[in-house]
Amino acid sequence: AHKAIDLKNWRSNQMNSGFLPHERAWMDALIDQVGWVDAFRVLNRQPEQYSWWSNRGQAWAKNVGWRIDYHLVTPDWREAVSAVSVYKDQRFSDHAPVVIDYDLNRRAP
């Protein structure tokens, strides 16, 4: 998970794989220095938008999850992002598909 908004219990997970400081720094570098864009967050900045839930306890039912599945795009695709969602109508595994729609007519040249 990249930011605290991307997992339910970020404070207690700061030293767990998937939210370690060096992992978050790597994502920061991809986005802030290299210039890649988190396509999901272009349109959805709401909390509790997760793509993975533990199979333990009631994580799915209580939406205690992490957003660890990403669409990273180059900056010229930012304006083309037209819809984003996490498909949760069916449960296929501990991950849910992250769906991004792109409007090719809105892509920057």
Model-predicted regions and their roles:
Residues W77-A80, R107-A108:
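Short helix-loop capping/hinge motifs at secondary-structure junctions, enriched
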